[in-house]
Swiss-Prot record:
The gene is MED10. PANTHER family: MEDIATOR OF RNA POLYMERASE II TRANSCRIPTION SUBUNIT 10 (PTHR13345:SF13). GO terms for cellular component: mediator complex. This is Mediator of RNA polymerase II transcription subunit 10. Coiled coil: none annotated.
Amino acid sequence: MSAPLENLETQLEMFIENVRQIRIIVSDFQPQGQNVLNQKINSLVTGLQEIDKLRSQVQDVYVPFEVFFDYIDQDKNPQLYTKDCVEKALAKNEEVKGKIEGLKKFKTNLLLELYKTFPNEMNNYRAYRKDSM
């Protein structure tokens, strides 16, 4: 992974950790924890600023809309998107492979039946096309 992406990943991990800590503080808020909460919120803002600075270094990264809508918004691991894409590609590959095999069998059967029905013409065809049978 390139350095800008590693920096972004590090900043995002720190941001997520800050949000997690803020959530813990807020869920059991006590007045004496106000200073810690303020520090965490300031750290969160600083983290967002750092992430914004890294934006220009990773502009060429394309993230499909489905990752946000179908995975992140649905509380799923975004890395499952890649797994699902590979599984869909494998399924489509198997489907196409089946069609190709079916067409090969059809070609073989068609040539055999044509040879039975039109032997002279098929001999001429075989002489013309060496790869036909």
